[in-house]
Every structure is written in structure tokens, then in C-alpha cells.
């Protein structure tokens, strides 16, 4: 496992403090590309109407909202996050959506029954979890057999030109954003470190497979600065035997 045994209290503190400016910060740091990436991921998912989805580390609810629209009024979407303040922002944004429920909880101990959801997503949240593999195994547990898991996260660019740009961005641009938006050095440093230290796409794919997911495929975005991992929980072939 990477050296990302995150301190829960520290991460919780960071997101409690940045909750009200998180959406704006996300837009600026990604140059609003996160919206483009998520739209493409939703297209790849092909979410069916009337299904049940879980958005892990839902934050302020952007992906939760996209899932709500996709499953329609007969479907259900649950968002879960460990930051109460982030959830409060999310609740304001989803107040008119009757098929959405937001709950407080831990990605490594999901408070749901086994085989509960058709889709489980996590967007820009896995890097903030103390143990990636434990969280992925929990996502597998609550996913229905044959269900789909999707992760959209920052990644490590592989193309030389993007690797150079990425390094320059972290060295010169991120500090400016951090000083503008973070209340403390701790917040700024965490936002930077959690992104830069996150595993590359091939290592993360292996983690998905170790967690029990099958047919895992990867799609890179913007030269590899972000990546989608999409996989499935194995179908239960014992039914009907």
C-alpha cells in the first residue's frame, strides 16, 4: 500500500473547513475539467432507470445529483460522506430531489446490507480514505452481484509532456490556490499531497481486482491527470441451482 495511511482526524478537519468553498476550489483546480470527465464517465456507465446507486465520499453531491437524474424518479440514490459540513452543502443542493438520501458515515465501514446497490461510485474521494483496499472491498460487499463500480480520481500522467506540466502545476500553481482558499497550511498541504501520492492507474486497477472486481477497465483523461476505473461484481451463479 502507498504511504497514504491518512490521518482520519486530519482529513476530517480539512473537509470540515473547506466545505463551503469546495465546489469553487474544485472548479478552479481542475479548470472545470472534472465536469467533463464525470459526464463522460456517466455516458460509459449507461445507468438504467429505476435502479439503486450509492455515491461513496459524495462530498457536496455533484455526482450524486448526476446519478439522481440518471436513475429517475423510480430509482434511488444514496450519498455517504464522513464530513458533516460537506453533507450540509450537499443537502442544500439536493433538497428538491426526492430520490436522494444523504447519510453520514465511513467509506471503510459502509452502514448498508450486502448486495444492496446496482451501482457504486466514488469520485475524487478514494485518495482521502486511510486504506484504499478496505474501502474498495466494502464497495464490493454492498454492490449487487453483476453490479457496476466506478471510480473517478486523479492519476499520474504517463505522457512526457503531461508529466512535466503536472510537476510544474504542483510546484507553482497549486501553492497559489492553496494560499487563496485554504485556512491553514495543513489544508493546503493535504490537498496537494493526497493528489500527488495517489497510485497510478495500473496499480489502482490491481487493487480493484484484489478487492474482488472483475472486467476492470481504465480510461484516462487529459493526458492521464485523471482516470476512470470501471468494474463489476461477479454474478451469483448459484441462484437457481
From Swiss-Prot:
Q: Which reaction does it catalyse?
A: a 2-demethylmenaquinol + S-adenosyl-L-methionine = a menaquinol + S-adenosyl-L-homocysteine + H(+)
Biological processes annotated in GO: menaquinone biosynthetic process; methylation
UniProt KW keywords: Menaquinone biosynthesis, Methyltransferase, S-adenosyl-L-methionine, Transferase
Q: Could you identify this protein by its name?
A: Demethylmenaquinone methyltransferase
Membrane-spanning residues: none
One Pfam family, please name it.
Answer: Ubie_methyltran
**Under which EC number(s) is this enzyme classified?**
2.1.1.163
Its taxonomic path starts at: Bacteria, Bacillati, Bacillota, Bacilli, Bacillales
Q: Organism, per UniProt?
A: Staphylococcus aureus (strain JH9)
Its UniProt pathway annotation is:
Quinol/quinone metabolism; menaquinone biosynthesis; menaquinol from 1,4-dihydroxy-2-naphthoate: step 2/2
The broad enzyme category this protein falls into is transferase
Q: What does this protein do?
A: Methyltransferase required for the conversion of demethylmenaquinol (DMKH2) to menaquinol (MKH2).
The record's listing under PANTHER family reads: 2-METHOXY-6-POLYPRENYL-1,4-BENZOQUINOL METHYLASE, MITOCHONDRIAL (PTHR43591:SF24), METHYLTRANSFERASE (PTHR43591)
Q: Which InterPro entries match?
A: SAM-dependent_MTases_sf, UbiE/COQ5_MeTrFase, UbiE/COQ5_MeTrFase_CS
User: Quick one: which residues bind S-adenosyl-L-methionine?
Assistant: 60, 81, 106-107
Among the GO molecular function terms of this UniProt record, one is: demethylmenaquinone methyltransferase activity
Which protein family is it in?
Answer: Belongs to the class I-like SAM-binding methyltransferase superfamily. MenG/UbiE family.
Amino acid at each position: 500500500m502507498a504511504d497514504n495511511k491518512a490521518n482520519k482526524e486530519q482529513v476530517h478537519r480539512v473537509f470540515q473547513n473547506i466545505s463551503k468553498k469546495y465546489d469553487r476550489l474544485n472548479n478552479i483546480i481542475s479548470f472545470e475539467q472534472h465536469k467533463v470527465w464525470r459526464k463522460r464517465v456517466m455516458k460509459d456507465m449507461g445507468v438504467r432507470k429505476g435502479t439503486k446507486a450509492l455515491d461513496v465520499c459524495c462530498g457536496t453531491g455533484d455526482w450524486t445529483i448526476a446519478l439522481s437524474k440518471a436513475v429517475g424518479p423510480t430509482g434511488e440514490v444514496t450519498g455517504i460522506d464522513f464530513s458533516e459540513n460537506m453533507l450540509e452543502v450537499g443537502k442544500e443542493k439536493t433538497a428538491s430531489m426526492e430520490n436522494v438520501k444523504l447519510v453520514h458515515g465511513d467509506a471503510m465501514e459502509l452502514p448498508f446490507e450486502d448486495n444492496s446497490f446496482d451501482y457504486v461510485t466514488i469520485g475524487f474521494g478514494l485518495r482521502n480514505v486511510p486504506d484504499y483496499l478496505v474501502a474498495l472491498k466494502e464497495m464490493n460487499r454492498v454492490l449487487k452481484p453483476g453490479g457496476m463500480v466506478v471510480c473517478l480520481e486523479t492519476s499520474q500522467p504517463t505522457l512526457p509532456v503531461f508529466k512535466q506540466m503536472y510537476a510544474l502545476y504542483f510546484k507553482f500553481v497549486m501553492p497559489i490556490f492553496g494560499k487563496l482558499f485554504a485556512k491553514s497550511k495543513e489544508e493546503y498541504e493535504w490537498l496537494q499531497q493526497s493528489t500527488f501520492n495517489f497510485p497510478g492507474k495500473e496499480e489502482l486497477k490491481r487493487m480493484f481486482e484484489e478487492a474482488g472486481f472483475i472486467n476492470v477497465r481504465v480510461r484516462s483523461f487529459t493526458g492521464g491527470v485523471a482516470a476512470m476505473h470501471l468494474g463489476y461484481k461477479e454474478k451469483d451463479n448459484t441462484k437457481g441451482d
